């Protein structure tokens, strides 16, 4: 087993996760089996109870693990399925050690950070690195480990010490450290500064780790003189200094790394049995990145949510939309709309914000209402859903978005004016959305219906079923405490809102479709968590197809995107116009 540790310096949030994912992608393209581990130094057991403004979205894994969004990057880049134990937190490690102490496993010894916490970290990493994450269920050959935060943070010290010890246990030829640092460029001088990187590397060495590669992040391409300066003052060879500047898409990052000889370096440093030349997989990434930058046609989607001030709150939703847009040769224009700004109260308090929000909603080609919790902003979401339904605008509701679509339909089509979810009004006389008591025992963390669950289609005549390849069932990831009231579904179906999918017992309603509408769809699960760059999520793909007026043609062709089922470079005789009609006339 080979281990690659990715650490960060200067500041957090400079792209360690994308760089770690890109390194994994390059190694996978060389024919190696790669897994990934993310270490978060916070004391929380997992990310399940975080506000989205704290760390961005909560990513859900197949086994129900609620984890850091970086694990979503690993899954998308590497096309693997990780587990909750691939996300290590300080809380998990301390809980593990304290439980062992309570069971008497330490035989009365004083339990300390060194050696007990550090040993637990090493043991966890070695055990989890062996767990298969590919469909072939074979043991991985390389484990990429990202240490969250920055070197010098007090929270991360036990983990740094654990890896200082681990590098000797694993042996030099099996352990490699990549340090990601920022090279700022102050506007006052325009000069790229290396001092923060020098100090960061010095701090790393002072803690017992020495970088094998220094990845320098910058806004603009870094000059060769800067590379030589970092090489000299950080005591590494020039080829061990890698530059990654801001690029138009994250698909370009693996290519930048490969162009700077990282495959050759890993082959020598870790004695890997690989070729120096990139494989077909990396060539597909190159073609995909080139295609992304050449797209001319634009599809605009309005995302109506309550956490719109931070784009990371909807990271997987954005990626799922981007994957689908790229698959149909369109550039995505995602417009974030704060749902509270669509409400009547905003018109009174700030009419400019109100009209700007509605202007964005009206000009969008499609509307998406994602998941969320709490009553704030729900009336604005209901307004957006009502507008999409009445104006026949393509709409996708995910989790809470589906539940609110049911509430809106009940109020305006069934004339149940007090219809609501018991999450927002426990005493409503028309509880069209109810809680699931078996998933709400009292504690907040880990008490929802989580992870991969099977959804069975009820009917052959379903757009979603066709988008999923006419399968009898699908397996997607869930994260919810509330469900549509199954006792009232017949009232909706009589008026044209069809429940086309349910759980294996037939009790929980998981998919809705509205009759006589181009695309009005809701799903109780989160399909964005399973979307991949080369395998876009079907519900999101359907939204983009409907928004560009090509859904019917796609369905009539048997749900085939192009002559090639994976991303092929578009040549002169394989243009998007030939593969998709420009629009459908109504």
Swiss-Prot record:
Catalytic activity: UTP + L-glutamine + ATP + H2O = CTP + L-glutamate + ADP + phosphate + 2 H(+)
UniProt keyword annotation of Protein biosynthesis present: no
Any one GO molecular function term: identical protein binding
The EC number(s) this enzyme carries: 6.3.4.2
Record field: compositional bias (Basic and acidic residues): 575-586
InterPro entries: Class_I_gatase-like, CTP_synthase, CTP_synthase_N, GATASE, GATase1_CTP_Synthase, P-loop_NTPase
Keyword Transmembrane helix listed: no
Active site: 399, 526, 528
Location of the Glutamine amidotransferase type-1 domain: 300-554
Biological process annotations from GO: 'de novo' CTP biosynthetic process; CTP biosynthetic process; pyrimidine nucleobase biosynthetic process
Source taxon at top rank: Eukaryota
Keywords annotated in UniProt: ATP-binding, Glutamine amidotransferase, Ligase, Nucleotide-binding, Pyrimidine biosynthesis
Chain spans, region Disordered: 562-586
One Gene Ontology CC term in the entry: cytoophidium
Listed pathway(s): Pyrimidine metabolism; CTP biosynthesis via de novo pathway; CTP from UDP: step 2/2
NCBIfam families according to UniProt: PRK05380.1, PyrG
Family, similarity comment: Belongs to the CTP synthase family.
UniProt cross-references to PANTHER family, sorted A to Z: CTP SYNTHASE, CTP SYNTHASE 2
Function: Catalyzes the ATP-dependent amination of UTP to CTP with either L-glutamine or ammonia as the source of nitrogen. Constitutes the rate-limiting enzyme in the synthesis of cytosine nucleotides.
Protein name, entry field: CTP synthase 2
Organism: Gallus gallus
Gene this protein is translated from: CTPS2
């Amino acid at each position: 087993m080979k281990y690659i540790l990715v650490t960060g310096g200067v500041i957090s949030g400079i792209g360690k996760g994308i760089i770690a994912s890109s390194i994994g992608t390059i190694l996978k393209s060389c024919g190696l089996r790669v897994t990934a581990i993310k270490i978060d130094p916070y004391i929380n057991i997992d990310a399940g109870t975080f506000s989205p403004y704290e760390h961005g979205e909560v990513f859900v894994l197949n086994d129900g693990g609620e984890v850091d969004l970086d694990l979503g990057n690993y899954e998308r880049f590497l096309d693997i399925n990780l587990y909750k134990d691939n996300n290590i937190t300080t809380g998990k490690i301390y809980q593990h050690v304290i439980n062992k102490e309570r069971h008497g496993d330490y035989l009365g010894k004083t339990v300390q950070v060194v050696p007990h916490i550090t040993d637990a970290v090493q043991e966890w990493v070695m055990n989890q690195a062996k767990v298969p994450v590919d469909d072939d269920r074979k043991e991985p050959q390389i484990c990429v480990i990202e240490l969250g935060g920055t070197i010098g943070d007090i929270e991360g010290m036990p983990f740094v010490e654990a890896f200082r010890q681990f590098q000797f246990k694993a042996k030099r030829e099996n352990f490699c450290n990549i340090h990601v640092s920022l090279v700022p460029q102050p506007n006052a001088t325009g000069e790229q500064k290396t001092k923060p990187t020098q100090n960061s590397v010095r701090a790393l060495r002072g803690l017992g780790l020495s970088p094998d590669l220094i990845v320098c992040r910058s806004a603009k391409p870094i000059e060769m003189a800067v590379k030589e300066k970092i090489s000299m003052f950080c005591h590494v060879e020039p080829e061990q200094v890698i530059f990654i500047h801001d690029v138009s898409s994250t698909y370009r990052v693996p290519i930048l790394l490969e162009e700077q000889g990282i495959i050759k370096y890993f082959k020598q440093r870790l004695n890997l049995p690989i070729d120096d030349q990139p494989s077909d997989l990396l060539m597909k990434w190159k073609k995909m990145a080139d295609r992304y930058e050449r797209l001319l046609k634009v599809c605009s989607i309005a995302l109506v949510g309550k956490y719109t001030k931070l784009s990371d709150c909807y990271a997987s939703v954005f990626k799922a939309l981007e994957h689908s847009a790229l698959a149909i040769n369109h550039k995505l224009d995602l417009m974030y709309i704060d749902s509270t700004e669509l409400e009547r109260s905003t018109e009174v308090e700030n009419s400019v914000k109100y009209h700007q929000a509605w202007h964005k909603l009206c000009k969008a080609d499609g509307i998406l209402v994602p998941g969320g919790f709490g009553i704030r902003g729900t009336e604005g979401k209901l307004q957006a859903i009502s507008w999409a339904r009445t104006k026949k605008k393509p709409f996708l509701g995910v989790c809470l978005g589906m539940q609110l679509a049911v509430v809106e339909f009940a109020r305006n089509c069934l004339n149940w004016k007090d219809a609501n979810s018991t999450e927002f009004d426990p005493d409503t006389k028309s509880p069209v959305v109810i809680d699931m008591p078996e998933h709400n025992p009292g504690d907040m963390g880990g008490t929802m219906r989580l992870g991969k669950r099977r959804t069975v289609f009820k009917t052959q005549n379903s757009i979603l079923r066709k988008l999923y390849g006419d399968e009898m069932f699908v397996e997607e990831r869930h994260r919810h405490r509330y469900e549509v009231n199954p006792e009232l579904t017949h009232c909706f179906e009589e008026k044209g809102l069809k429940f086309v999918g349910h759980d294996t017992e037939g009790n929980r309603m998981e998919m809705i479709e509205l009759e006589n509408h181009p695309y009005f769809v809701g799903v109780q699960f989160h399909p964005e968590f399973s979307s991949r760059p080369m395998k876009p999520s079907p519900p999101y793909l359907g939204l983009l197809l409907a928004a560009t007026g090509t859904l019917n043609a796609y369905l009539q062709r048997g749900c085939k995107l192009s002559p090639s089922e994976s991303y092929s470079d578009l040549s002169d005789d394989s243009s998007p116009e030939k593969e998709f009609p420009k629009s459908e006339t109504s």
